[in-house]
């Protein structure tokens, strides 16, 4: 018997002081049966960090040809490709060839650092790639905010991201491992 995705709803007020972006988004996230709350909330964090009217969640773990989020223009050109985890170098290179900007959000603490030590040198010359690491204490704290129906506020200022519900606020400071040139 196949397990179905669990649907989560998030009403998210996003205030990005760095980009002067203020908007409310009603989001629907389908959590794949193998996806953890931590990973799902990191998808939500990535959305908040790059929010726009054209940024969308994809089939994610259910598809090998799509990232976790992407932003396309009206012609279907991929402007932004956002991936979570530790993708293979071949997949990253393919994404960089298809999209104007590729952003990788690493997490999982020490395993992410080991992945970057093994993969980073091979990616150093890719000009449209940004690699960010989310410290494990931040991603685990974000996971605690996961509920089937969420009312969240996201504030971004000076590269720091605060995600809050009515009771708890989590500050996330992404570590920049590689920045788009």
Question: What do these predicted regions represent?
Answer:
Residues 87-144:
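Feature captures the catalytic cores and cofactor-binding loops of soluble hydro-lyases/lyases
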Residues 58-60, 72, 82-85, 105-108:
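Short His-Asn-centered micro-motif
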Residues 16-61:
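Acidic-basic catalytic patches of nuclease active cores, encompassing PD-(D/E)XK
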Residues 10-12, 69, 160-164:
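Short polybasic amphipathic segments
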Residues 44-50, 63-66, 70-72, 90-91, ...:
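Terminal alpha-helical anchor/extension segments at protein ends
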């Amino acid at each position: 018997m196949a397990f179905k995705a669990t649907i989560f709803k998030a009403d998210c007020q996003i205030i990005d002081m760095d980009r002067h972006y203020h908007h409310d988004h009603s989001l629907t996230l389908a959590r794949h049966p193998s996806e953890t709350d931590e990973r799902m909330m990191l998808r939500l964090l990535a959305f908040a960090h790059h929010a726009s009217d054209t940024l969308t969640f994809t089939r994610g773990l259910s598809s090998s040809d799509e990232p976790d989020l992407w932003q396309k223009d009206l012609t279907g050109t991929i402007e932004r490709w956002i991936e979570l985890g530790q993708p293979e170098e071949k997949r990253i290179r393919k994404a960089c060839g298809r999209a104007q900007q590729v952003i990788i959000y690493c997490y999982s603490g020490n395993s992410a650092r080991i992945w970057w030590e093994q993969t980073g040198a091979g990616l150093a010359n890719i000009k449209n790639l940004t690699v960010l690491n989310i410290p494990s204490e931040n991603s685990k704290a974000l996971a605690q905010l996961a509920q089937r129906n969420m009312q969240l506020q996201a504030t971004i200022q000076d590269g720091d991201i605060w995600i809050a519900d009515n009771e708890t606020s989590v500050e996330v400071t992404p570590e920049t491992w590689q920045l788009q040139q």
